């Protein structure tokens, strides 16, 4: 039998055409959805809808497009935040290695950051009995330090001391102190930590500590409304209740890496509900 001569160039040309057609079909089927920012179906449908409205009401469409862009950025932040949090909470990344040029203000609970040797004592402006009304006393010191990050870790004494009748009054005053800090240190990132709850037998000392969850709800809303970063630490109580001291108020040494992880992740990337 006579062997047939194979036309290699022709075969390669056919293969190239087939591949090109497949790529074209794939692109058309995706409809150009593979932008630099990965979009949800909801955002994509919104863009298609806006295209049909743009000629009718351009100003309204312009505002909606801005909101959609912010939603896309929010999704990007969330996608970055979760892997970082996972690395920090698992111990894969040492959270304290990320603390550069900072100041921590707070009460006796915040003292633990330097007491256990995690952070510099000179940068932890905290002591037993302190409330947010101590913040103005640190204004000059903070301006001198000019830190890149400030972490506010108050709430336990604030809730029980009686200066505020409810969470609304407390949150309103808290926001004013943060705004003053922002005015004095415009390049500083400020993070408000949620109030970490107490547990038995602490309630024998103050029944008002049972109101901490309610105060947190109000404080979180106030921060969101005023563009203030809020570190929601509720998960720490749910996941690590045994890391509270026997007094039900303070924390064991092993607690601080978890708390610091949530604080620094919020400062670097934003919270689960980022400030606008």
Predicted regions and their residues:
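Catalytic His-Asp segment of secreted/periplasmic serine-dependent ester chemistry enzymes
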Residues: 198-276
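N-terminal secretory targeting modules
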Residues: 1-99, 270-276
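Charged helix-capping and loop-helix junction motifs
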Residues: 167-177, 209-215
């Amino acid at each position: 039998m006579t062997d047939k001569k194979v036309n290699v160039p022709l075969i390669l040309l056919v293969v190239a055409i087939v591949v090109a057609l497949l790529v074209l079909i794939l692109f058309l089927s995706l409809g150009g959805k593979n932008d630099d920012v990965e979009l949800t179906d909801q955002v994509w449908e919104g863009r298609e809808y806006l295209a049909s409205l743009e000629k009718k009401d351009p100003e309204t469409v312009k505002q909606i497009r801005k909101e959609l862009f912010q939603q896309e950025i929010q999704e990007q932040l969330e996608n970055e935040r979760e892997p970082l949090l996972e690395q920090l909470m698992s111990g894969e990344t040492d959270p304290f290695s990320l603390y550069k040029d900072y100041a921590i203000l707070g009460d006796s609970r915040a003292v633990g950051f330097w007491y256990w040797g995690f952070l510099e004592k000179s940068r932890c402006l905290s002591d037993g009995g302190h409330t947010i009304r101590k913040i103005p006393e640190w204004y000059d010191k903070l301006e001198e330090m000019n830190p890149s990050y400030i972490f506010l870790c108050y709430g336990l004494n604030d809730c029980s001391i009686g200066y505020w009748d409810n969470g609304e009054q407390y949150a309103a005053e808290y926001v004013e102190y943060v705004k003053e800090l922002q005015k004095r240190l415009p390049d500083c990132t400020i993070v408000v930590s949620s109030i970490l709850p107490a547990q038995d037998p602490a309630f024998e000392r103050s029944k008002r500590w049972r109101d901490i969850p309610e105060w947190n709800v109000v404080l979180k809303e106030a921060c969101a409304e005023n563009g203030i970063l809020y570190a929601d630490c509720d998960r720490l109580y749910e996941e690590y209740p045994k890391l509270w001291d026997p007094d039900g108020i303070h924390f064991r040494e092993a607690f601080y890496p978890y708390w610091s992880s949530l604080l620094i992740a919020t400062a670097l990337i934003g919270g689960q509900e980022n400030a606008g």
